[in-house]
């Protein structure tokens, strides 16, 4: 299905017996490269946004065209959401140098062949609109929280922190099966190629996002109000400037309809620092305990395969 194609039928997409996303398939997909629109994968619907502003899809039929024709898409949606990152030329799907705990040359990753083929063929890919959330959690996760809980990519969820890089990779790759998605799509932990290309897309709107992502939840963010895990008045809370406070997903300011690539939690990627046996993995983007200029969306930080309260992850979806 392409944007503007309203011929797709079908029932609620998503996981088996999932009361939020139902079972079955919404619409169809020809998966042909689209020169005049974005390909919507089987089992998903177009919600709103544009190729330039950040086109949002959802795996719940209830969200279909809710923000059609609008550049900004709200968070009051039912399904898991992804944002299209257009890539006109495969040469633009690349890693970019930003500040980090070590120099750029210390970090490495070979472009996965399946990602290259998908991005080159479809002229883009989808990235999770939010950090991965914990579907079962009724409060923020704590040390020792289960890593068998289901993932969400929705607003108002507890960030899926206290997870190792190995666990994050497994959870991201298993999301497709969890949701009973079509065999034509693949879900993965974000690579450095996908991360940096998403930043490049965002920087068409906010030119310094990779180096100063003040829209996210940082310790030095301006004071703002947010809603706790349960969407009730008693959970209306304030995050004050100068305080490091983890908050639910989708509570800050989106750029191109994407939330918190900078701030809230560091996010595990598949990039490596191979020269280190002690700290061979890479996290990106800073957290609620850091500053937005010192640890912006582009920042790289090496670490061991440990579960931390300030670290979560983000999914990508490839056609």
Predicted regions and their residues:
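Residues that flank catalytic or metal-binding motifs in active/ligand-binding sites
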Residues: 78-81, 121-123, 254-255, 261-264, ...
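GGW-centered surface loops in extracellular recognition modules
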Residues: 22-93, 187
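Acidic glycine-/aspartate-rich tracts in secreted/extracellular proteins
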Residues: 88-90, 130-134, 270-276, 288-289, ...
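Short, solvent-exposed loop/turn elements at domain surfaces
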Residues: 91-97, 134-140, 291-294
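Disulfide-stabilized, aromatic/cysteine-rich ligand-recognition loop
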Residues: 25-26, 163-176, 185-186, 190, ...
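Active-site-proximal beta-strands of protease catalytic cores
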Residues: 262-272
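Short aromatic-cysteine micro-motif
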Residues: 76-79, 101-260
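Ser/Thr/Gly/Pro-rich low-complexity, disordered linker/stalk segments of secreted
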Residues: 1-29
């Amino acid at each position: 299905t392409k944007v503007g194609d309203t011929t797709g039928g079908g029932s609620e997409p998503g996981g088996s017996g999932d009361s939020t996303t139902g079972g079955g398939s919404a619409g169809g997909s020809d998966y042909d490269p689209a020169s005049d629109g974005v390909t919507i994968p089987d089992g998903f619907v177009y919600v709103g946004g544009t190729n330039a502003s950040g086109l949002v899809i959802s795996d719940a039929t209830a969200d279909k065209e809710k923000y059609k024709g609008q550049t900004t898409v709200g968070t009051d949606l039912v399904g898991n959401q992804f944002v299209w990152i257009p890539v006109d030329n495969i040469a633009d799907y690349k890693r970019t140098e930003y500040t980090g705990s070590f120099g750029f040359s210390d970090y490495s990753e070979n472009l996965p062949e399946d990602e290259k083929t998908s991005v080159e063929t479809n002229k883009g890919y989808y990235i999770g609109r939010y950090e991965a959330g914990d579907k079962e959690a009724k409060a923020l996760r704590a040390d020792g929280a289960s890593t068998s809980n289901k993932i969400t990519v929705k607003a108002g969820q507890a960030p899926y922190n206290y997870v190792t890089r190995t666990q994050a990779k497994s959870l991201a790759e298993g999301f497709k099966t969890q949701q009973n998605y079509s065999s034509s799509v693949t879900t993965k932990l974000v690579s450095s190629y996908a991360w940096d290309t998403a930043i490049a897309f965002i920087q068409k709107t906010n030119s310094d996002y990779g180096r100063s992502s003040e829209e996210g939840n940082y310790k030095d963010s301006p004071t703002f109000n947010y809603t706790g895990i349960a969407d009730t008045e008693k959970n209306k809370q304030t995050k004050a400037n100068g305080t490091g406070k983890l908050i639910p997903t989708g509570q800050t300011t989106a750029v191109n309809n994407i939330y918190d690539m900078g701030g809230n939690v560091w996010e595990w990627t598949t990039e490596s620092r191979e020269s280190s046996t002690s700290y061979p993995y890479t996290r990106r983007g800073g957290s609620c305990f850091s500053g937005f200029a010192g640890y912006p969306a582009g920042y790289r930080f090496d670490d061991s395969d440990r579960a931390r309260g300030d670290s979560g992850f983000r999914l990508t979806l490839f056609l």
